[in-house]
Amino acid sequence: MCDMIKPSFIPGLEIRQLRDLMRYRTKLTNMKTSEKNRALNCLTVSNLKLDDVFSDVFGKSSTSIIQYLLEHPGESFDVRPFIHARCKTPVEEIQAAVEGAISVPQAIKLRQCLNHINEIEKHREEINLEIQALAEPFSPVLELLRTIPGLDTQPITAIAILSEIGPDMSVFPTSKHFISWAGCCPRNDRSARRTKSTRISRAGQSLKPLLVQIANALLRSKEHPEFKNRYRRIKANRGHKKAIIAICKMLLTAIWNVLSKVEPYSAKGYLEPKPAK
């Protein structure tokens, strides 16, 4: 078509394979979360308030108590042998939290939920090994990505980003092109000098949730004030959602610069210099 139609960006085969496994891993994680919520519902219906006394209902202490409740329904017992030494909740509060009684139908449902959670976790571990193997050839790129704030907390985070964007930033002439491709720039719906919508586009359906998750975690940390300062400034005038998208754009700009220049992240250069007006 004489270069009249711009081609779509399609990453290489290795990245597409990595992306497929990473998205499947995300679905497994969502399935695991759903099963945990169902298990918590069983406990709540049975008046077993373990979520009030344990920060993680599926931790060692809480899980051992749940297993005993399933194996000995309706039996009163002392919770002391099941409590881990590091548990800070008073024993009396934990004892009061297990005074409820679980019915047979709820016990069946809870047991199935716990078994399903364990099965999903096994599948996730197998997928993680395959993901690590596929990501091995991209180790230099991943090392650069992990210099960016928010991508250095867990190794899998940088792999997830890489699987969505690929290692080659030359396909995006500028960081603005990259941000637009990721779906983090406002649309320009205008007609007769009237602006109909400035909402962000629907592109990046898998990338944007990941960026928002990283941005929220980054804002909770005590480091990297350049992100927090920008978030607070925008939130004060335009609200939380627009401020979070602004942080996502900062992350995308940092990613584009790091991969384009093949240089580690620097707080001084996370944004391109703006041209003088």
Predicted regions mapped to residue ranges:
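A detector of single, family-specific signature residues
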Residues: 1-277
